[in-house]
């Protein structure tokens, strides 16, 4: 039974999604259906945690909108996710960045930048 589940999940998993880690700033294009129309809605924020693996992986993204903190839990393999783009690589020393919830203003999104191999070359 376990092999059957793994086989089905392997066919359902998306390969076009980049590796996202806590601390990264990402821009996610989500499909939104309003009546008969379908449009894309961008959501840009800091990844404060991830959960699960494979087809059930989710990421929690936080942004500040008009002075109010907004968090969305986004299933990575959802058909409503058009694309995920990493805007900035962040350096986090823990897996869950829930301490950002207590911060206000610019400090609420402040995470040090991670140096990547491509940036150093």
Curated annotation (Swiss-Prot):
<keyword id="KW-0689">Ribosomal protein</keyword>
<dbReference type="InterPro" id="IPR008991">
    <property type="entry name" value="Translation_prot_SH3-like_sf"/>
</dbReference>
<dbReference type="GO" id="GO:0003735">
    <property type="term" value="F:structural constituent of ribosome"/>
</dbReference>
<comment type="similarity">
    <text>Belongs to the bacterial ribosomal protein bL19 family.</text>
</comment>
<comment type="function">
    <text>This protein is located at the 30S-50S ribosomal subunit interface and may play a role in the structure and function of the aminoacyl-tRNA binding site.</text>
</comment>
<dbReference type="InterPro" id="IPR038657">
    <property type="entry name" value="Ribosomal_bL19_sf"/>
</dbReference>
<dbReference type="Pfam" id="PF01245">
    <property type="entry name" value="Ribosomal_L19"/>
</dbReference>
<keyword id="KW-0687">Ribonucleoprotein</keyword>
<dbReference type="GO" id="GO:0006412">
    <property type="term" value="P:translation"/>
</dbReference>
<dbReference type="InterPro" id="IPR001857">
    <property type="entry name" value="Ribosomal_bL19"/>
</dbReference>
<dbReference type="InterPro" id="IPR018257">
    <property type="entry name" value="Ribosomal_bL19_CS"/>
</dbReference>
<dbReference type="GO" id="GO:0022625">
    <property type="term" value="C:cytosolic large ribosomal subunit"/>
</dbReference>
<protein>
    <recommendedName>
        <fullName>Large ribosomal subunit protein bL19</fullName>
    </recommendedName>
</protein>
């Amino acid at each position: 039974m376990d092999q059957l589940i793994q086989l089905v999940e392997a066919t359902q998993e998306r390969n076009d999604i980049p590796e996202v880690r806590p601390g990264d700033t990402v821009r996610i294009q989500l499909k939104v259906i309003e009546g008969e129309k379908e449009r894309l809605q961008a959501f840009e924020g800091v990844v404060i945690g991830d959960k699960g693996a494979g087809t059930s992986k989710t990421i929690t993204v936080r942004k500040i909108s008009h002075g109010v903190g907004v968090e969305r839990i986004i299933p990575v393999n959802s058909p409503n996710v058009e694309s995920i783009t990493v805007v900035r690589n962040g350096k986090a020393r823990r897996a869950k960045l829930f301490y950002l919830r207590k911060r206000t203003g610019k400090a609420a999104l402040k995470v040090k930048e991670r140096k990547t191999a491509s940036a150093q070359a």
